[in-house]
């Protein structure tokens, strides 16, 4: 049996360290204008995920794409968002079956590789009565083609408010690398990109 610590009403969110708070403030200021890209460099284990979550908050992002290199990081990232009191709809796009992991089931994290299912979900993000207020999509670099297919699925899928690329050094280099499609605004549509 797996025990997962989920957000509880009244539980305080993590307080960023001063360097994290400064990074969030600077990144939000930089990324405020649609069409911008930003680079955040920090050592392993220094809280880059928390900074990214708080940047999304600071931008008021309702539709977020968070791209990671591995299945373990996909699960870890989903749980980090939940621990930071993010209760919005959340889906992992990869070969990971969230239904087969007790921690992800308890955290109410879905998974799919079906562009039409994801497109249906993404198309109802908004403030209307029949809409969901926010959606976080966590995707592995290997599954980026599913995001591209979703955005071309025929649903009225808006661009992501923010796309975050974890371990971005993996997408550097030649533009024709499979994972580099996340840099191409014609293939993966996002108003802002954070590397």
Where do the protein language model's features map onto the residues?
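Conserved helix/coil segment N-terminal to the catalytic DExD/H
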Residues: 119-159
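Conserved catalytic network of the ASCE P-loop NTPase/AAA+ motor domain
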Residues: 58-59, 85, 128-131, 154-157, ...
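Walker A/P-loop
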Residues: 33-56
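SF2 helicase catalytic motif II
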Residues: 142-143, 153-195
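Conserved Walker A/P-loop ATP-binding site and its immediately adjacent core
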Residues: 54, 58-98, 141-143
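Conserved helicase motor
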Residues: 92-121, 140-146, 170-171
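Pre-Walker A (Motif I) flank of P-loop NTPase domains
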Residues: 33-39, 61-62, 134-135
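Conserved pre-motif I regulatory segment
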Residues: 2-41
């Amino acid at each position: 049996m797996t025990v997962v610590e989920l957000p509880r009403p009244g539980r305080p969110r993590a307080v960023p360290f001063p360097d994290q708070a400064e990074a969030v403030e600077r990144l939000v200021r930089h990324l405020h204008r649609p069409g911008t890209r930003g680079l955040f460099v920090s050592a392993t284990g220094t809280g880059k995920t928390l900074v990214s979550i708080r940047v999304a908050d600071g931008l008021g992002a309702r539709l977020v794409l968070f791209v990671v290199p591995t299945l373990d990081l996909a699960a870890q990232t989903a749980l980090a968002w939940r621990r930071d009191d993010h209760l919005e709809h959340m889906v992992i796009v990869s070969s990971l079956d969230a239904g087969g992991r007790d921690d992800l089931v308890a955290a109410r994290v879905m998974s799919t590789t079906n562009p039409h299912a994801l497109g249906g979900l993404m198309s109802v993000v908004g403030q209307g009565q029949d809409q969901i207020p926010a959606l976080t999509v966590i995707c592995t670099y290997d599954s980026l083609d599913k995001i591209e297919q979703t955005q071309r699925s025929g649903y009225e899928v808006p661009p992501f408010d923010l796309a975050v690329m974890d371990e971005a050094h993996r997408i550097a280099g030649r533009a024709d690398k499979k994972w580099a499609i996340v840099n191409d605004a014609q293939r993966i549509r996002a108003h802002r990109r954070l590397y």
